[in-house]
C-alpha cells in the first residue's frame, strides 16, 4: 500500500521543469507544438494514467497507454478546442469510441484545464465526475458517453450530419478513436457505409490497432484482417501508420482535414506502450497495476520525461526542431 500512497502524493506531474504550456486556441496560429514537445506530452499523459489506475485499483491501463501518442497529437496540436469554452459551437469534436480507455482522455482534459489535475485521483470513485467510461453529463470536454463497442463511429457520423444541418460542417471536424473491438462489431461497418453514402467530408476515424484483447490476441478472438482495405472497400480514404511515430501520427491527422471524403487512419500500436513490463503483453487488459508495478512504471516514465525535457530544452537553445 505504501507504493499507492506515494503515487497519490505526486499530483502535479512536475518532477522536472515543464516546457512552454500548450498555447491557447486563439494564440495557436502558425505556432504549433513540435514533435519533441508532443512526445513529451504523451509521456506526461501516460504517467497520469498509471497514477490514476494505481489509486483506483481498476480500469484499463494498457488500452490507455497504446493511445497516448494519438491523443497527445490530437489535443495538443490538431484539435480546435477551448477549455474556457467547452461548448464553443465551432470546436472540433473528439469521440473516444473505445470508452474503456477513458483515463487517457481524462488526462488530456485535465492537463488542458477542463478540470483540476487533482480530480484525476478520483477515477472510478463514487460521486466522481471521472467514471470508468466517459460520461458527457458529468465531465467537461466529453462530447459523447461511450463504452459500448461498435457504437462510436455511428455517433461520429450523427455528429457530422448534425454539424451539416447547423451549417458548420466545413469548419468543425469530427475525430473518432476506435479499437480492435470496435472493428469486430457490425455497427461500425454500417456507419462506414453511411459516411460515404451521405457524402461526409469532416470525419476521421483512427483505429488504435493494438492486437490484444481480454481473452487473447485480436487474431485469436475474432480476426478483423486488413482494416485499411475494409475501409477503402467502403469508399473511405485510408492509410496505415505506426501509431507510436509522432511524425506519422501528426502528418496523417493534419492531412485528414484536407481530404474531401471520410478518412480512416489505421494506427499499428502496442498495448501498454511506454511501460516496459506491460508493453505488448497479454494479461493487463482491465487489470490495474500492482503497487510494485505502478511504482516501477512511474519511475520509468519520470526518467523518460526528464530525458525528453532536457533534450527539448537543448533543441530550443540550439534552434533545432524535433
Each language-model region and where it sits:
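Glycine-rich beta-alpha junction loops
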Residues: 69, 100-101, 210-211, 245, ...
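Generic secondary-structure signature for well-ordered alpha-helical cores
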Residues: 47-58, 76-80, 110, 114, ...
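Cofactor-binding active-site loop characterized by glycine-rich and histidine/acidic residues
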Residues: 52, 64-190, 196-197
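Structured core elements
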Residues: 95, 204, 240, 264-266
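HDAC/HDAC-like amidohydrolase catalytic core signature
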Residues: 2-39, 44-115, 322
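Thiamine diphosphate
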Residues: 141, 145-148, 153-257
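Short acidic, glycine/serine/threonine-rich loops at helix termini
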Residues: 106-108, 135, 187-189, 215-219, ...
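Glycine/aspartate-rich loop-and-adjacent alpha/beta segment that forms the canonical ThDP
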Residues: 3-9, 246-322
Amino acid at each position: 500500500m505504501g507504493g499507492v500512497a506515494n503515487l497519490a502524493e505526486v499530483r502535479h506531474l512536475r518532477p522536472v521543469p515543464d516546457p512552454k504550456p500548450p498555447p491557447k486556441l486563439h494564440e495557436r496560429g502558425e505556432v504549433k507544438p513540435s514533435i519533441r514537445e508532443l512526445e513529451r506530452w504523451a509521456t506526461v499523459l501516460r504517467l497520469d494514467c498509471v497514477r490514476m489506475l494505481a489509486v483506483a485499483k481498476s480500469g484499463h491501463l494498457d488500452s490507455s497507454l497504446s493511445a497516448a501518442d494519438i491523443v497527445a497529437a490530437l489535443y495538443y496540436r490538431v484539435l480546435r478546442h477551448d477549455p474556457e469554452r467547452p461548448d464553443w459551437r465551432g470546436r472540433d469534436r473528439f469521440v473516444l469510441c473505445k470508452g474503456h480507455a477513458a483515463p487517457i482522455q481524462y488526462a488530456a482534459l485535465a492537463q488542458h484545464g477542463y478540470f483540476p489535475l487533482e480530480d484525476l485521483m478520483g477515477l472510478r470513485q463514487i460521486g466522481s465526475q471521472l467514471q470508468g467510461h466517459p460520461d458527457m453529463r458529468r465531465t467537461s470536454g466529453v462530447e459523447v458517453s461511450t463504452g459500448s463497442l461498435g457504437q462510436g463511429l455511428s455517433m461520429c457520423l450523427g455528429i457530422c450530419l448534425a454539424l451539416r444541418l447547423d451549417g458548420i460542417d466545413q469548419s468543425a471536424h469530427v475525430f473518432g478513436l476506435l479499437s480492435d473491438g470496435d472493428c469486430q462489431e457490425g455497427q461500425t461497418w454500417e456507419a462506414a457505409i453511411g459516411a460515404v453514402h451521405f457524402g461526409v467530408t469532416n470525419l476521421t476515424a483512427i483505429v488504435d490497432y493494438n492486437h490484444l484483447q481480454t481473452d487473447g490476441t485480436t487474431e485469436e478472438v475474432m480476426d478483423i484482417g486488413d482494416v485499411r482495405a475494409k475501409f477503402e472497400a467502403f469508399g473511405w480514404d485510408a492509410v496505415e501508420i505506426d501509431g507510436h511515430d509522432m511524425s506519422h501520427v501528426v502528418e496523417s491527422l493534419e492531412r485528414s482535414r484536407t481530404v474531401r471524403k471520410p478518412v480512416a487512419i489505421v494506427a499499428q500500436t502496442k498495448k501498454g506502450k511506454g511501460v516496459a513490463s506491460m508493453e505488448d503483453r497479454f494479461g493487463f487488459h482491465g487489470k490495474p497495476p500492482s503497487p510494485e508495478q505502478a511504482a516501477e512504471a512511474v519511475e520509468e516514465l519520470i526518467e523518460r520525461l526528464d530525458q525528453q525535457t532536457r533534450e527539448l530544452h537543448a533543441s530550443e537553445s540550439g534552434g533545432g526542431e524535433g
